[in-house]
Amino acid sequence: MKPGSKNSFKSLRQISINGKNYKYFSLKEAEKNGLDGISKLPKSIKVLLENLLRYEDDLTVSKKQIEAIKDWLKTKKSETEIAYRPARVLLQDYTGIPAVADLAAMREAVKEKNKDPNPINPLSSVDLVI
């Protein structure tokens, strides 16, 4: 199952701009389809909610995590750990170079076992600034 393939709250929408189609997750639609009251969430929490909707797959992001955001409105606290998956990661050289070295070492170890090293990649796009 690929990320975002669940769409439990039927929030996936499409918009056409200059003849090109773009998909997005509508918080208004999610609110209509079970996430009551989310329009009252602070903007920072809405960003987290949109990210959860985008990556819901029942493996890394579950419906329970999404509902925990809605439930936060009642109690202003939650014991549920939620996933956050940024679209892009920016690394400076102090953190980026060791990460690249780790990836290279993992690829080399996999290659030595006669396996395909190509799947060993970051889940998110990464920019390394040196």
Predicted regions and their residues:
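Fe-S-dependent hydro-lyases/dehydratases of central metabolism
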Residues: 1-130
